[in-house]
Amino acid sequence: PPRPTPLFHFHGLMDKNAPFEGGNGCGPGDTSALLPVPDVIADWHTMFGCQEGEEVTLLETAEARCTSKAGCEDDVQLCVFPDGIHSWPGSAEKESPIRECRGGEHVSSFSATEAIWEFFSGHELEVSTP
């Protein structure tokens, strides 16, 4: 993007539709290899001028681990779910055409909707006038 924009990425480590480590997923429409999530997040850290060094742990539970880096021009947060699949955490679990390739479990105790609302509520978009 032309300016830093907050990024909040959720990903299940057992997601076989969009594998965390990259490569080809399974399910309808999977025709191209995906980049590994750690590489994509590292690219965002570079674009946003994040400081080298340790991640800051924002949340750590049995079902979720959310991290960020210090000194970025805007927030880049990653929440991973060790047993998580390709679903929206905290939503009602639904049948899906990708069910046969999902692997792990649907995350029900973490609300992605509440987390992303809280995340973006803490950011303002500066509007420039021409």
Regions picked out by a protein language model, each given a short descriptive name:
Residues 1-130:
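Flexible, surface-exposed loop/gating regions in the mature catalytic domains
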